[in-house]
């Protein structure tokens, strides 16, 4: 489990940045509700000073965007619960909130905001020290890329366009979720997410040499990189 102080303070951002030094996500090995909770607690994206937190924020933002979820909202209060505020999201529950804690245990069997034990803190420090001290060659990194692919006109068969795009297969390239987004005049563009192994795939080269040349350019007019984030 992970616990953070006020995430809109320097201390909170520093804690988050250190936590993400050896992790791609808040907990586990894929995006979860924990990432959404922390993402929502941040009033604005972390600055480049917090390299790891900024990288994580951009990645979660891209995942939300491809899922059709806006990163902004007008605020919400659920009857019988506290407003979603910095304190409610980022601060551990008060000691006398026994009933609320019991309900959370029934739902998840995990106290998401409990404090780290000494063993967990020590293990996290050892992992961070190991990463900094390691002289071994790092494994090739991965990146998450969101691409806009535009057709020639409103008569372009978008199903065939998507099939043509996904027909591009190479080592280190993994196609993900996609959706059609209206752009006007009856025309829709394909927005698609992919994951690449940085040392094996160049997105720019793939666009220039495969996505915009024959036979795929029968359907594809142009491609734009919307988001590019290290993971």
UniProtKB/Swiss-Prot annotation:
Record-listed N-acetylalanine modification sites: 2
Lineage top rank: taxon: Eukaryota
CDD domains tied to this protein: EF1B (cd00292)
Biased composition (Basic and acidic residues): 119-129
Function noted in UniProt: EF-1-beta and EF-1-delta stimulate the exchange of GDP bound to EF-1-alpha to GTP.
Subunit field text: EF-1 is composed of 4 subunits: alpha, beta (1B-alpha=beta'), delta (1B-beta), and gamma (1B-gamma).
Protein name: Elongation factor 1-delta 1
Species of the source: Arabidopsis thaliana (Mouse-ear cress)
């Amino acid at each position: 489990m992970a616990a953070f102080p006020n995430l809109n303070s320097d201390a909170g951002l520093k804690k988050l940045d250190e936590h993400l030094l050896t992790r791609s996500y808040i907990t586990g090995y894929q995006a979860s509700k924990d990432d959404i909770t922390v993402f929502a607690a941040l009033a604005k994206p972390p600055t480049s000073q917090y390299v790891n937190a900024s990288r994580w924020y951009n990645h979660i933002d891209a995942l939300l965007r491809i899922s059709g979820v806006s990163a902004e909202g007008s605020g919400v209060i659920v009857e019988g619960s506290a407003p979603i505020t910095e304190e409610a999201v980022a601060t551990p529950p008060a000691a006398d909130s026994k009933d609320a804690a019991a309900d959370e245990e029934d739902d998840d069997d995990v106290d998401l905001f409990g404090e780290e034990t000494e063993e967990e803190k020590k293990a996290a420090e050892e992992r961070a020290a190991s990463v900094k001290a390691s002289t071994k060659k790092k494994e090739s990194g991965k990146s998450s890329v969101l691409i806009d692919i535009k057709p020639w006109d409103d008569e372009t068969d978008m199903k065939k366009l998507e099939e043509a795009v996904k027909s591009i297969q190479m080592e280190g390239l993994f196609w993900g979720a996609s959706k059609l987004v209206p752009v006007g005049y009856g025309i829709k563009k394909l927005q698609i997410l992919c994951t690449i192994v940085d040392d094996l795939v160049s997105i720019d080269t793939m666009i220039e040499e495969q996505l915009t040349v024959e036979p795929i350019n029968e359907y594809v007019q142009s491609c734009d990189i919307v988001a590019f984030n290290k993971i």
